[in-house]
Amino acid sequence: MNLERVSNEEKLNLCRKYYLGGFAFLPFLWLVNIFWFFREAFLVPAYTEQSQIKGYVWRSAVGFLFWVIVLTSWITIFQIYRPRWGALGDYLSFTIPLGTP
């Protein structure tokens, strides 16, 4: 989609939809929101909807960073402690690696 062909109101509406969609456990939408609207929020000359778009982009960045930290922490903890959790670790695993820990 070419954002230059879209009205400022429609840009704001689309940015808001991607921001709200990220709350449905879809942090990828926040990343898309950041990439698509960063230029509109911070680099183009000012217009009336820009401050709202800027807010959505900032909040999308914070939400995406939060999800990256949470998922990285969980993956690290799970990879390190899964063998110690015994049956629970096996139950949470999609595939169980062969061999000894």
From Swiss-Prot:
Keywords: Cell membrane, Endoplasmic reticulum, Golgi apparatus, Membrane, Notch signaling pathway, Transmembrane, Transmembrane helix
Record bears the keyword Cytoplasm: no
Tissue: Widely expressed. Expressed in leukocytes, lung, placenta, small intestine, liver, kidney, spleen thymus, skeletal muscle, heart and brain.
Residue ranges annotated as Lumenal topological domain: 79-101
Keyword Transmembrane applies: yes
Principal subcellular localisation of the protein: endoplasmic reticulum
Short name of one Pfam family: PEN-2
Consequence of substituting E10S: Induces a N-linked glycosylation on N-8
Intramembrane sequence windows: 18-36
Natural source organism: Homo sapiens
Protein name (Swiss-Prot/TrEMBL): Gamma-secretase subunit PEN-2
Record: disease: Acne inversa, familial, 2, with or without Dowling-Degos disease: An autosomal dominant form of acne inversa, a chronic relapsing inflammatory disease of the hair follicles characterized by recurrent draining sinuses, painful skin abscesses, and disfiguring scars. Manifestations typically appear after puberty. Some ACNINV2 patients also exhibit reticulate hyperpigmentation consistent with Dowling-Degos disease.
Family listed: Belongs to the PEN-2 family.
Ranges in the topological domain labelled Cytoplasmic: 1-17, 37-57
